[in-house]
């Protein structure tokens, strides 16, 4: 016999039998190891075609959090500890995806360092480290690809919830980088 999982809300979204067939592409960590932006661009195009086929208008990704530890719960999803590699790989995926008419949602902006209690955690980071490590990949991806959306992270950054942070969302993202997409 097989026990099927039921969500805490009683819905069917957790049932494996309700999912649709889809291609299993390599995870973010594997993609970054290739350093092959053309291959990642082609993968973005393939993802875009699958999304179009399934009626998906915006893909909730890529995620480019900095991989601080291999033990992070979703660390496999993120590209690297290097913001240049992360930004370049993300831009390639985004450009391929959006070339097929499907938007990307670059996430989690910014300094989302843990999955454990991430809505309660506060990432305390000096501005220089924030800009050189945690924001540089986002800036690079946004400059090279203009994703349709940017998803804020769930944590606080230096005491301010990132989804309400005027420094992060207005000063940096909008004013300094010129991003005009949806947040």
Regions found by a protein language model. Give the residues of each.
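Glycoside hydrolase catalytic-domain context in secreted enzymes
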Residues: 1-183
């Amino acid at each position: 016999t097989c026990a099927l999982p039921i969500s805490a809300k009683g819905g069917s979204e957790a049932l494996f039998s309700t999912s649709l067939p889809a291609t299993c592409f390599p995870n973010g960590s594997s993609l970054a190891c290739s350093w092959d932006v053309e291959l990642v661009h082609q993968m973005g195009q393939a993802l875009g075609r699958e999304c179009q086929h399934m009626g998906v208008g915006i893909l909730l990704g890529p995620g480019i959090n900095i991989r601080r530890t291999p033990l992070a719960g979703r660390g496999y999803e993120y590209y690297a500890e290097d913001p240049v590699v992360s930004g370049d790989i993300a831009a390639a995926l985004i450009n391929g995806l959006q070339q097929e008419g499907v938007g990307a949602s670059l996430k989690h902006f910014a300094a989302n360092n843990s999955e454990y209690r991430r809505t309660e955690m506060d990432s305390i980071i000096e501005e220089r480290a924030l800009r050189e490590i945690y924001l540089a990949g986002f800036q690079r991806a946004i400059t090279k690809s203009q994703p349709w959306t940017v998803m804020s992270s769930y944590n606080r950054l230096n005491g301010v919830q990132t989804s309400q942070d005027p420094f992060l969302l207005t000063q940096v993202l909008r004013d300094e980088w010129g991003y005009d997409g949806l947040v």
